[in-house]
Amino acid sequence: IMKQGQENQVWIAGGIGITPFISYIREHPILDKKVNFYYSFRGKENAVYLDLLRDYESKNPQFELHLIDSTKDDYLSFEHKKIQKRATVYMCGPLTIMKPLAKQIKKKSPMSELIYEGFKFK
C-alpha cells in the first residue's frame, strides 16, 4: 500500500506499531519516495529494530529517521513540524497516540491523505 502513496510520505510508528513498517522495509531495500519516519517508543529497552532502521537510512538518502524516546523527549507532536501539502501519512500504533496525531496532521495539512491502523490494549 505504501508503494501507491504520494511522492512525499510520513510514516509514524508508536511502539509495536513499527511492525508493518519493518515488513515494508525488508521487502523494499531501495525507496523511490521521500519518507520521513517517526518512531516513538518508551525507553531504549523497548525500541526495536534500531540497527535495521539506521542501516536503511544510511542506504536510502530519501529516508529520514526521527527517533522519539518518550522517557527522555517530549511526546511526538506535529504542532511545529512541517508536512508537505499532499503527503501520504501512514500511522500505526496505540489509539491513544494515533488519534491526537491524526488531528494535528489534518489541521496542519488538510490535503494530506491519512491512513492509519490504531489498536487498544485490553
Model region roles, listed by residue range:
Residues 1-122:
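FNR/FR-type flavoprotein reductase catalytic core
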